[in-house]
Amino acid sequence: MAEKEHYERTKPHVNIGTIGHVDHGKTTLTAAITKVLAAKGLAKAEDYADIDAAPEEKERGITINTAHVEYETEKRHYAHIDAPGHADYVKNMITGAAQMDGAILVVAATDGPMPQTREHILLARQVGVQYIVVFLNKTDLVDDDELVDLVEMEVRDLLSEYDFPGDDVPVVRGSALKALEGDPEQEKVILHLMDVIDDYIPTPKRPTDKPFMMPVEDVFTITGRGTVASGRIDRGTVKVGDEVEIVGLTEDVLKSTVTGLEMFHKTLDLGEAGDNVGVLLRGISHDQIQRGQVLAEPGSIQTHKNFKGEVYVMTKEEGGRHTPFFSNYRPQFYFHTTDVTGTIELPDGVEMVMPGDNVTFTVNLQKPVALEKGLKFTIREGGHTVGAGVVSDILD
């Protein structure tokens, strides 16, 4: 048993999820995958009802229902998320409660692409999911193969419309329900789908391989040694002697060298993504660095004031606003570790935004912030979270 434990950790880890229109079979497919892989000793079979009764979670103050299942193929370990309701799915994507490296788009061959199919593809594009594999479900209910071909073409066109490689995206046809009921042919289809996912969705770059970045949470002075910035390393690694830049909240970028590194009050040789560390900085005084800035590998991140965001606006029940907002609304945007006031401009044709809406708008921040596409933020008003978003485009 102990050996197996060790083996499991050596497989590369990938996060995926099922997306698509309501009742097209996302949860049935999730259950079928666990059942078929369980028969090979690679998963624990999860019941449809268990997946569907997803527990509530809080992410950045927003309540989301999400089911998490895990399973393995010969090559990889997967964490798979399935969000039962459409609103849950939207919230999941935007808050980053479930970071997806790739997604399985489930489309019922009986219906073809529906409104939420389009919406989920758009969201996947906005939040940076780069790889989509299509499962054409319920093909057993369509007598005419040409109709299935037609649906496949429609799905490919739709993916191309949102800048996915529609012509190259793998499409697998089958029946998730039949596989779940034990039909041997359809069980083979599920195994084929997993092979396709293994091959098509690349193993993500580990956070430690990316350029160093740490949002600053706190700054203090150690007498006789200098200024320490503390925080959780977001990505990359850092060691004594590394050059870093202090970026954000001002137009100036300061350079410094790391002269000491501590974790849990012990010295550290190498800090890596996920570690909470204190970084001693050469030649930096206490008033030259503040919470909300980031320490980063030189040249790896810039400040911006204007961006486009994909946003979920919380409902009154979730603790959000009770009333709509309009262009020129000026809440605080919480990035990394600090609030910055920004002015919202709604897109043409959108007069106002209601609590519960999912919307794309542009923001002009009062101060420059270290921003990049894919960065998550919350929107706050008087200390309360009223929405969550992700940077979908930089505009300056």
UniProtKB/Swiss-Prot annotation:
Residue ranges annotated for the tr-type G domain, each copy included: 11-205
Residues that bind Mg(2+): 27
G4 as annotated region, ranges: 137-140
Annotated compartments: Cytoplasm
GO cellular component, one term: cytosol
Binding site residues for GTP: 20-27, 82-86, 137-140
Catalytic function, reaction form: GTP + H2O = GDP + phosphate + H(+)
UniProt-annotated stretches for the region G5: 175-177
Transmembrane portions of the chain: none
EC number of the protein: 3.6.5.3
GO molecular function, one term: GTP binding
G2, as annotated region: 61-65
Pfam families per record: GTP_EFTU, GTP_EFTU_D2, GTP_EFTU_D3
Keyword presence, Transferase: no
Region described as G1: 20-27
Swiss-Prot/TrEMBL keywords: Cytoplasm, Elongation factor, GTP-binding, Hydrolase, Magnesium, Metal-binding, Nucleotide-binding, Protein biosynthesis
Entries under NCBIfam families matching the protein: EF-Tu, PRK00049.1, PRK12735.1, PRK12736.1, small_GTP
Family: Belongs to the TRAFAC class translation factor GTPase superfamily. Classic translation factor GTPase family. EF-Tu/EF-1A subfamily.
Subunit note: Monomer.
Name of the protein described by the UniProt record: Elongation factor Tu
Organism in which the protein naturally occurs: Limosilactobacillus reuteri (strain DSM 20016)
Source species taxonomy: Bacteria, Bacillati, Bacillota, Bacilli, Lactobacillales
Gene that produces this protein: tuf
